[in-house]
Amino acid sequence: MADPAECSIKVMCRFRPLNEAEILRGDKFIPKFKGDETVVIGQGKPYVFDRVLPPNTTQEQVYNACAKQIVKDVLEGYNGTIFAYGQTSSGKTHTMEGKLHDPQLMGIIPRIAHDIFDHIYSMDENLEFHIKVSYFEIYLDKIRDLLDVSKTNLAVHEDKNRVPYVKGCTERFVSSPEEVMDVIDEGKANRHVAVTNMNEHSSRSHSIFLINIKQENVETEKKLSGKLYLVDLAGSEKVSKTGAEGAVLDEAKNINKSLSALGNVISALAEGTKTHVPYRDSKMTRILQDSLGGNCRTTIVICCSPSVFNEAETKSTLMFGQRAKTIKNTVSVNLELTAEEWKKKYEKEKEKNKTLKNVIQHLEMELNRWRNGEAVPEDEQISAKDQKNLEPCDNTPIIDNIAPVVAGISTEEKEKYDEEISSLYRQLDDKDDEINQQSQLAEKLKQQMLDQDELLASTRRDYEKIQEELTRLQIENEAAKDEVKEVLQALEELAVNYDQKSQEVEDKTRANEQLTDELAQKTTTLTTTQRELSQLQELSNHQKKRATEILNLLLKDLGEIGGIIGTNDVKTLADVNGVIEEEFTMARLYISKMKSEVKSLVNRSKQLESAQMDSNRKMNASERELAACQLLISQHEAKIKSLTDYMQNMEQKRRQLEESQDSLSEELAKLRAQEKMHEVSFQDKEKEHLTRLQDAEEMKKALEQQMESHREAHQKQLSRLRDEIEEKQKIIDEIRDLNQKLQLEQEKLSSDYNKLKIEDQEREMKLEKLLLLNDKREQAREDLKGLEETVSRELQTLHNLRKLFVQDLTTRVKKSVELDNDDGGGSAAQKQKISFLENNLEQLTKVHKQLVRDNADLRCELPKLEKRLRATAERVKALESALKEAKENAMRDRKRYQQEVDRIKEAVRAKNMARRAHSAQIAKPIRPGHYPASSPTAVHAIRGGGGSSSNSTHYQK
């Protein structure tokens, strides 16, 4: 505590305007204002106050005059009190509260809530503030907590400094004006009001809003504390004017009784002669004991009616204000000393106590000498100057025959009476505590009974609902599992079939490319043979012409000779014909020999093709196994990566094919050059054909070796994936067993709330899995669309190539037929070449027909796959809708469960509220230098100067 100082109570007088009833009644406006401090009622005497506020005064002006300075004093460590006094309907509640959320019409209390924080944010940044508020009312002379309506009869106690306080009152820590306003709104909703003839919203109780501010300097550790009482008194009433009856009349009696007790306290303090001030006559005066004549800066706002109808009450109120103005309060700063200061004070008091003990001992020795009849010389007598220089004497006991000092009788009686009075007051406080505890216990037990009944009924209903919902969800879960299994199986089949078809398409494309290469080679050979054939035809035509000319000449000669010789011409013609027939027979024999060789080559090529088909079938089987393994792998890998890999592989294949095409074109050019060089002999061509067949066999062996290596790698990968599938299946079985155990435990346990939470979590996990499966399905659908587009493009290009190939073949066949018709009797070499080309054409037509059949098979398979894809899409949509419904049901169940848990928590909190009336709360420290954050409920310790803010949590008990 700092050194005390004396100050008087400030009294402000406020007159309200005439209300509608007074204007309609024609009441006269009686006050006359003389300056800012004097008012005269009618023709009476003047009343002087610290400030007189006329009816046109705004709420802000009232606040600046009455409360602004007190806020600064409280933040400097003083106690403060502001209360409004006056008759009913005189504007007390309007002055103290006003319209809470209207910036123009809000009263003193909400303005103080904002002004406190404005002052704090402009103060030194090293200060840290803890602000807590409480709100209670005195109704029927019982203290009722407005923040906890279950506390209906609280007791008033005194702390170690004999300062009264309300025991058990709810205290809320606040850190922003919004939180203070929330507390005010909550408390105001619980306050007692009633309708009377003079006021539609008449307060039926005295309300007290207490703000407790503690501040600490984090550098110097200096601690200050201040309390601010904001009191809205209920107005005094005349029953003849208010028309109160029944419960309202009882309330009016208690209001007038407590206000008369307040008047008695003011009168006793104003006279200054009475030794006893009746603070204990009412609980309101007991709470305001420190505000009236104690350690507090107090401002009283007396509210008056200007109507002549209320002239007597107005004069009584003004007299009350004049008496209160004479009261003196002794105020001091509430300074909490630090440990070092306490230590210094203790040492100082210890030294003082030591010197006083020495003085007492010397005085007792001197007194003992006087009582024994010994005269003590003046130089040995102890004076006030010598007290500090005394040495401690021996601890000699005081003699027993010292006569006790008898005090005055009046002092003993006074002390005795004071002790009796204090003991009676203590008994009274104990009885109040006991009554309060019993009443709270009774209400608590009643509430517990109601809560238990309601809780039991609700838990039964909820248990039945939860059981029904659980069975329904189990059925839906099983159905969903079956559908998911079917969808997965269908997707697996679809993926396997698609991979097979894609592999077949790739094989066909490769075969097609090979055939196109062979076709290009054959076309080149065909063009060369056609050129040779044209040259031979020209030569044969020239020879025919010469032969015909020679024959004609010979025939002429023979005819001339035949005229002379009769039959020789026929013989010569027969001989000529015979020679021609021999040549034709030789050519036919040579052609038949070539045909037999070509047939043997065709049979050998067919055998090679059958072997290649077998290897292709084996390769397809291994590729199907590989596709199945890749399907299992693709379920665990991202489709995007696989697509990018696939595109890269396709790009590499395209580049390889382009490179191979370039190399083949180069080889083709070389072969053309070789063919031009080796056109002389047909045997060289046969050798080249044999070398090509050997190269084909070597390529086939290399392909078989490559496929064998691929097959081994695929087999290893398949075994590894099967092991992973077995492990996953074991994990699934373990999870299923765990789920069954949890379900069995759920049927046995009495409380189902935690189990429902676990089931909700499992349901969410399943939903997430289904969502992942759905995402994978969507990715697979997109991949399938992309592959379908690529397949369709490849098929289109193949179809176009087929058309071009057929057209080219038809044109060439027509040309060859025309050439055959033109040249029926060519040479044997020409016929051999023609037969060779015919055989090649037959092989090419067979290959083309096979490609057409494969294309038709693929087109037949395509609608089946599309149909299966549509079915899977519909099934997935149905699963999505079922999943959505299950999710919505789960959300509804969770909300209902959360509401039930909140209701149970509220019931338990209401049951245990009385038990933990003084339990620990989290304080919200405030530091100057910053305005509060956007969230009003956030716990912030704010430093000034734009520094960083750090969260700080303090626990107060």
From Swiss-Prot:
Family label: Belongs to the TRAFAC class myosin-kinesin ATPase superfamily. Kinesin family. Kinesin subfamily.
Entry-linked CDD domains: Khc_CBD_cc (cd23649), KISc_KHC_KIF5 (cd01369)
Keywords: ATP-binding, Cell projection, Coiled coil, Cytoplasm, Cytoskeleton, Disease variant, Hydrolase, Microtubule, Motor protein, Nucleotide-binding, Transport
Gene expressing this chain: KIF5C
Name this protein carries in UniProt: Kinesin heavy chain isoform 5C
Entry's EC annotation: 3.6.4.-
A single cellular component GO annotation: neuronal cell body
Function description: Microtubule-associated force-producing protein that may play a role in organelle transport. Has ATPase activity. Involved in synaptic transmission. Mediates dendritic trafficking of mRNAs. Required for anterograde axonal transportation of MAPK8IP3/JIP3 which is essential for MAPK8IP3/JIP3 function in axon elongation.
Primary location group: cytoplasm
Impact reported for E237K: In CDCBM2; the mutation results in a significant decrease of excitatory post-synaptic currents when expressed in cultured primary hippocampal neurons; decreased localization to distal regions of dendrites; accumulates in dendrite cell body
Domain notes for this protein: Composed of three structural domains: a large globular N-terminal domain which is responsible for the motor activity of kinesin (it hydrolyzes ATP and binds microtubule), a central alpha-helical coiled coil domain that mediates the heavy chain dimerization; and a small globular C-terminal domain which interacts with other proteins (such as the kinesin light chains), vesicles and membranous organelles.
Subunit structure: Oligomer composed of two heavy chains and two light chains. Interacts with GRIP1 and KLC3. Interacts with TRAK1. Interacts with ZFYVE27.
Residue segments, region Disordered: 911-957
